[in-house]
From Swiss-Prot:
GO terms for biological process: negative regulation of DNA-templated transcription. It comes from Paramagnetospirillum magneticum (strain ATCC 700264 / AMB-1). It holds the Pfam family Zn_ribbon_NrdR. Coiled coil: none annotated. PROSITE patterns: ATP_CONE. Residues 49-139 form the ATP-cone domain. Keywords: ATP-binding, DNA-binding, Metal-binding, Nucleotide-binding, Repressor, Transcription, Transcription regulation, Zinc, Zinc-finger. The gene is nrdR2. Negatively regulates transcription of bacterial ribonucleotide reductase nrd genes and operons by binding to NrdR-boxes. InterPro entries: ATP-cone_dom, NrdR-like_N, RNR_NrdR-like. Binds 1 zinc ion. This is Transcriptional repressor NrdR 2. One of its GO terms (molecular function) is DNA binding.
Length: 153
């Protein structure tokens, strides 16, 4: 595997082990060229999922987009990176279990929101503000009002 820091082609695997949910192999690697260490994940890909966007365009499902959006929503929250990886794996497995080759982007967003609602309401609000395209403070207030009534408060 190529080193992401210096670009050298040959890196050494120092440690391999399954992730907690057994959905991937975590490999610690070292670059003999620059001495950097980094982690890679190896996953089985059964088929390519295609995401159908709101405008009708299609693109291959990118698990890293889910991870990055979770990282942004959970920034400075008490959540470890491995938890974020497990959440992304769970969302991917749920999408694959549908048995469809194409999934609407709306479904992915809703799955992320469902997980965040249960896990961390601050992260849920952060994600919702982008996903639901909040434009002004009133949008937050309206959404918080709906959150309060839907959670039985």
């Amino acid at each position: 595997m190529r080193c992401p820091f210096c670009g050298q082609d040959d890196t050494q695997v120092k440690d391999s082990r399954p992730t907690d949910d057994n959905a991937a192999i975590r490999r610690r690697r070292a670059c003999p060229g620059c001495g950097s260490r980094f982690t890679t994940f190896e996953r089985v890909q059964i088929r390519d999922l295609v995401v159908v966007k709101k405008d009708g365009s299609r693109s291959t499902f990118d698990r890293e987009k889910v991870v990055k959006s979770l990282q942004i929503a959970l920034r400075k929250r008490p959540v470890e990176d491995d938890q974020i990886e497990r959440i992304a794996n769970g969302i991917y497995r749920r999408l694959e279990s549908l048995g469809e080759n194409e999934v609407p982007s709306k479904l992915i967003g809703e799955l992320v929101m469902d997980v965040l609602m249960e896990m961390d309401q601050v992260a849920y609000l952060r994600y919702a503000s982008v996903y639901r395209n909040f434009r002004e403070a009133k949008d937050f207030g309206d959404f918080l009002g709906k959150m309060g009534t839907s959670s039985g408060d």
